């Protein structure tokens, strides 16, 4: 079974938990005079993954996709180091206002597991920077067996990551969530370096729904259960939570859908989150 999935999602309590108290403190520090930025997208633009999404005869999928949504979780950068030219090609196909959220290459996160990765990280960031103003936020997704014993590697990676490039991190191992002292150490690190703590809403790992923001930005990865009723209710729940966070000071929302097996336009309209 793939990470975060459940054999019986119909038995999962999908209600959002209450916020960590520190989330309100983080949001209240934000400048409420800033305009709202809401970015909604998927984890792929391939027509084989977004069934029923593209009109018949669509040839340039990214060009069409980027005019329906304003962001994308870019997984292609996870599987191989992106070249400068590839980044420029992607960038130039998307309109102004679109944002790419590229995942850190697996050679850094999964193969070397953040050990001795400075040269690779520099190469990655040099190439990714060619997204220019269409770069949303780079995100580091660590393997679910990356544990607290490797915390020093995470510290080093964050301390040496270019400050000009916004960074988010998704932790997966249960140790990061079931030990308060460990969790607090991570959150302090993230807050110190302005690293966004990704919240994952997935059926099989409700502990990833920690509701603990470390920057005044909400980066949500929503894993669909592909049940129209429960997914609709979950999305409504998120919209209500965002309303609370906006009142507290939230001005940046990144909401990325993943594992949506059959696209239904009326079901996940991007405008629903913007409203």
Language model regions located:
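Residues lining hydrophobic/aromatic ligand-binding pockets adjacent to catalytic sites
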Residues: 1-275
């Amino acid at each position: 079974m793939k990470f975060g999935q459940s054999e019986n999602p119909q038995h999962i309590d999908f209600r959002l938990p209450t916020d960590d108290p520190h989330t309100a403190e983080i949001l209240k520090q934000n400048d409420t005079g800033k305009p709202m930025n809401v970015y909604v997208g998927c984890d792929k633009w391939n027509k084989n993954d977004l069934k029923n999404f593209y009109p018949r005869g669509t040839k340039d999928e990214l060009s069409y996709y980027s005019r329906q949504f304003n962001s994308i979780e870019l997984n292609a950068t996870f599987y191989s180091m992106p070249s400068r030219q590839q980044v420029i090609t992607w960038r130039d196909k998307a309109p102004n206002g679109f944002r790419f959220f590229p995942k850190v290459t697996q050679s850094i996160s999964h193969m070397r597991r953040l050990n001795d990765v400075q040269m690779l990280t520099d190469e990655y960031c040099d190439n990714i920077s060619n997204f220019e103003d269409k770069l949303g936020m780079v995100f580091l997704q660590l393997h679910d067996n990356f544990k607290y014993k490797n915390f020093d590697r995470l510290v080093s990676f964050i301390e040496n990551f270019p400050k000009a490039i916004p960074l988010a991190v998704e932790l997966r191992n249960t140790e990061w969530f079931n030990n308060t002292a460990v969790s607090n150490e991570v959150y302090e690190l993230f807050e110190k370096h302005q690293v966004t703590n990704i919240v994952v809403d997935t059926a099989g790992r409700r502990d990833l729904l920690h509701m603990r923001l470390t920057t005044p930005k909400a980066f949500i990865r929503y894993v669909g259960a592909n049940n129209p009723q429960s997914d609709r209710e979950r999305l409504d729940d998120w919209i209500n939570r965002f309303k609370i966070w906006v009142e507290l000071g939230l001005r940046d929302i990144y909401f990325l859908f993943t594992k949506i097996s059959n696209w239904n336009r009326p079901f996940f309209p991007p405008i629903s989150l913007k409203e």
